[in-house]
UniProtKB/Swiss-Prot annotation:
It catalyses: 5-amino-1-(5-phospho-beta-D-ribosyl)imidazole + S-adenosyl-L-methionine = 4-amino-2-methyl-5-(phosphooxymethyl)pyrimidine + CO + 5'-deoxyadenosine + formate + L-methionine + 3 H(+). It comes from the Bacteria. Its EC number is 4.1.99.17. Substrate binds at residues 239, 268, 297, 333, 353-355, 394-397, 433, 460. GO terms for molecular function: 4 iron, 4 sulfur cluster binding; phosphomethylpyrimidine synthase activity; zinc ion binding. It holds the Pfam family ThiC-associated. This is Phosphomethylpyrimidine synthase. Pathway: Cofactor biosynthesis; thiamine diphosphate biosynthesis. Changing residue 324 to K: Shows thiamine-independent growth under anaerobic conditions, but thiamine dependent growth under aerobic conditions. It comes from Salmonella typhimurium (strain LT2 / SGSC1412 / ATCC 700720). Its cofactor is [4Fe-4S] cluster. It is an enzyme of class 4 (lyase).
Length: 631
């Protein structure tokens, strides 16, 4: 029975069963490895794909094999990808970063929650059954201190998070010895700096320059450090979250775990339904990846969905609430200025960003400047106290191909650049959000404008979608644009699922969106010439040419689908060793023919060589032993 045919009660029960029976799980023929750093508690997780040996000769009774090296790959699944770790969603994940946060001695536990709304929720006994039981006591920077990774980087301090990231970004490629696997085409990097080996000092330098961010709230110690910047691997974000009409806490936690399994580097909780506060707590306590939010969504819920009733005070309380829960980055639509709103009147699709439309409506109804812009310095002060990164939202992004690259879009982008410099005054980390709907020939301008206007702060885009004609397939239309803008320098790609413009995605939609965007991100890394990016491709090509079917499945981004497609026509075990697939059959397989040509050419070379030696032997008189001068 597919998810779409289940009742709401059945969906919740299924999600609850998933949570109750959750165990650490490895991908087929993969194992979890940990690469250690300079101190014992820096243990960086990676997935190592084990490969079978290559048959190189011998006989049927005595075959000769050559070993193939295991291929290490980046792993976002956290403890969920380690079969040796006991998982208990009720207790949450281990607090990996807590010792590092405590050792810095620049933060302190709060006596009480700073948010009035949080205090109200905690006092409500009716929420006991929904509430995560092991609530942390939130921390905040001590008076006069800043606790951001940007602050440490500017002070010349290499944090454990930075060392963790350096090891992670190198992806264990130093373990690979095979020249075949290490071979890589030169890339075209459009000015990106891509060192052969990423060091902790390089990570620090990039963060200090504002070219990269490490989203790592001190109240989310469960997260594994990662970095977003154009001089690192291209990252992918997945969106989850309930709505007023569908989804539950259990389903959102299930989607979180599912997202990290399929490669989400960060996850945004875009919940707009009931129990937003409680849902977010469960997500944070069980998330090994950074969590982002759009605080204006929850602030709007607090005023019963009436945009005109929003106030700075309600929004500020929401920021404090979420920062003390552990949210790692906020999307803030502070660039939607009153004077920019009329620019959207001539658009075909107007303002399509939820956050952008909320703020535009507030500005027009009060005929005042955006209160997020007016109070931006106060927002930065809050972020600096918890190390919440800012994702400056593109509230005026184009929602159709016709509206791409217009005056409203780039006016807002210029303002985001000004806000970036203000945030940096407070040592707050910043990335910039981008479009949207942009045809292929207009995509590169978005990247060059962002780098110039926003001082090389990391770019984070939704696609962009390259055509508007394919509802139901917008993971494809946007994946094309995502690969291109990732190549041009975009640091993180926000996935689009097949449900875009149509409905709230389910588990399968999340997987489809993530696989599509992992392809786009990897294609961008290859095109940029990111060191080591081609290793997995080379391993796959070698396995494909050698008809190592199991290795082909296991090297795939989605081993299960690869195997299922193969087995639709060749399900027998003999099909896993056959030197053909059902596409061409045994007589027309190009790779089988290529192998035969190669073997024939090698035999011909040997035969010609033997003939030459025979002729030389006869020319020298046919003597078995020659005098030294003749030899």
């Amino acid at each position: 029975m597919s998810t779409t045919t289940l009742t709401r009660r059945e969906q919740r029960a299924k999600a609850q069963h998933f949570i109750d029976t959750l165990e650490g799980t490895a991908f087929p023929n993969s194992k979890r490895i940990y690469v250690t750093g300079s101190q014992h508690d820096i243990r960086v997780p990676m997935r190592e794909i084990q490969l079978s040996p290559t048959l190189i000769g011998g006989s049927k009774d005595n075959p000769q094999f050559e070993e193939n090296e295991a291929v290490p790959v980046y792993d976002t699944s956290g403890p969920y990808g380690d079969p040796e770790v006991a998982i208990n969603v009720q207790q949450g994940l281990a607090k990996l970063r807590q010792p590092w946060i405590d050792a810095r001695n620049d933060s302190e536990e709060l006596d009480d929650r700073s948010s009035a709304y949080t205090r109200e929720r905690l006092a409500d006994d009716g929420l006991d059954d929904l509430r995560f039981t092991g609530l942390l006591t939130p921390k905040r920077a001590k008076a006069g201190k800043r606790v951001t990774q940007l602050h440490y980087a500017r002070k010349g301090i290499v944090t454990p998070e930075m060392e963790f990231i350096a090891i992670r970004e190198n992806m264990g490629r130093e373990r690979i010895r095979s020249e075949v696997l290490r071979h890589q085409h030169p890339g075209m990097n459009f000015g990106a700096r891509l060192p052969e080996n990423i060091t902790p000092e390089f990570v620090r330098d990039e963060v200090a320059a504002g070219r990269a961010i490490i989203p790592a709230n001190i109240n989310h110690p469960e997260s594994e450090p990662m970095i977003i910047g154009r001089n690192f691997l291209v990252k992918v974000n997945a969106n989850i979250g309930n709505s007023a009409v569908t989804s539950s806490i259990e389903e959102e936690v299930e989607k979180l775990v599912w997202s990290t399994r399929w490669g989400a580097d960060t996850v945004m909780d875009l919940s707009t339904g009931r129990y937003i506060h409680e849902t977010r707590e469960w997500i944070l306590r069980n998330s090994p990846v950074p969590i982002g939010t759009v605080p204006i969504y929850q602030a709007l819920e607090k005023v019963n969905g009436i945009a005109e009733d929003l106030t700075w005070e309600a929004f500020r309380d929401t920021l404090l609430e979420q920062a003390e829960q552990g949210v790692d980055y906020f999307t803030i639509h502070a660039g939607v200025l009153l004077r920019y709103v009329p620019m959207t009147a001539k658009r075909l699709t107007g303002i399509v960003s939820r956050g952008g439309s909320i703020m535009a409506k507030w500005c027009l109804s009060h005929h005042k400047e955006n209160f997020l812009f007016e109070h931006f310095r106060e927002i930065c002060e809050i972020c600096a106290a918890y190390d919440v990164s800012l994702s400056l939202g593109d509230g005026l992004r184009p929602g159709s191909i016709q509206d791409a690259n217009d005056e409203a879009q780039f006016s807002e982008l210029h303002t985001l650049g000004e806000l970036t410099k203000i945030a940096w005054e407070y040592d707050v980390q910043v990335m910039i959000e981008g479009p949207g709907h942009v045809p292929m020939h207009m995509i590169q301008r978005n990247m060059t404008e962002e780098l110039e206007s926003c001082h090389e702060a990391p770019f984070y885009t939704l696609g962009p979608l390259t055509t508007d004609i394919a509802p139901g397939y917008d993971h494809f239309t946007s994946g094309i644009g995502a690969a291109m803008i990732g190549w041009f320098g975009c640091a993180m790609l926000c996935y689009v699922t097949p449900k875009e413009h149509l409905g709230l995605p389910n588990k399968e939609d999340v997987k489809q969106g993530l696989i599509t965007y992992k392809i786009a991100a990897h294609a961008a890394d290859l095109a940029k010439g990111h060191p080591g990016a081609q290793i997995r491709d080379n391993a796959m090509s070698k396995a494909r040419f050698e008809f190592r079917w199991e290795d082909q499945f296991n090297l795939a981004l989605d081993p299960f689908t690869a195997r299922a497609y193969h087995d639709e026509t060749l399900p027998q075990e003999s099909g896993k060793v056959a030197h053909f697939c059902s596409m061409c059959g045994p007589k027309f397989c190009s790779m089988k023919i290529s192998q035969e040509v190669r073997d024939y050419a090698a035999a011909q070379t040997i035969e010609i060589g033997m003939a030459d030696m025979s002729e030389d032997f006869r020319a020298k008189g046919g003597e078995i032993y020659l005098k030294r001068e003749e030899a």
